[in-house]
C-alpha cells in the first residue's frame, strides 16, 4: 500500500525546490507529512511541450482522491484546472500566491509573440523582464525551448479557466508584497470561487517559503490541522 500524506504540494515555475527546504523541515518536525511533487519540465527533466491538460492529467495521477493539496503560482493554476475538471478530486485546495487569472497585458503579448516565432532569441531586456514577471526566472533566452512554449500555453490556458466551476473548498493565502501575481488577483479568485476563504500576509512576497519560511510553515500547520479536525468531525 502506498504511503499517504497530509499535504501534497505542486511548486511554481522553478527548476529547484531547495528554497522550500526550511518550510518543509519545520512541517516535518511538527508531524505534518508533506509530499512535494516534481513538475515535469521543471524539477523533473523533460523536453516535451506541455499543455494545461497534460499537467492536469499528471496531477490527477500523482495526488490521491480526497487529499489536501497546495499549489504555488503555476502549481495553483494546475490545481485550479484539476478541480474545475474533477470537482470531487480534492477534499480541500490551498492556493499560495496562485497563477490562473487572465489579464491582458503588453508583457504577455511580448512573451507569447516571441515564443511562437520559434527562432533563437538574443538577450532582450524587455523580454527577460516580462519572463521574470511571470516565472521568477531572469533570462528568457536561456530557458529551454520547450518550456518557453509551455509558459505560453499556461498563460493562454487562463483564458479558458472557469473559476466559478471550482467547487472545492479553497483557502487562499497571499502575500501583500507579491509583485508577480499581485494581491488584486487573489481578490479576483476569491470573488469567483463558490467556496473560498482569503487571507493576506503583510510580509510575504510571491515566494513566502523564501521571505518568511517560518511564517508559512506556521500558517500551513494550522490550516492542515484545522482541515483534518474538521474532516474527523471534531
Regions found by a protein language model. Give the residues of each.
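Flexible "cap/lid" loop of the alpha/beta hydrolase fold
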Residues: 80-84, 90-122
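Short beta-strand/loop motif that positions the catalytic acidic residue
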Residues: 166, 172-174, 178
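Active-site loop/oxyanion-hole signature of alpha/beta-hydrolase fold enzymes
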Residues: 35-70, 218
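Gly/Ala-rich beta-loop-alpha elbow adjacent to hydrolase catalytic centers
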Residues: 71-75, 79
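Conserved HGGG/HGGXW glycine-rich cap/lid loop of the alpha/beta-hydrolase fold
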Residues: 2-44
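Conserved alpha/beta-hydrolase "acid-adjacent" motif
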Residues: 179-185
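Conserved alpha/beta-hydrolase catalytic His-Asp/Glu region
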Residues: 116-168
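Catalytic histidine-centered segment of alpha/beta-hydrolase-like enzymes
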Residues: 204-213
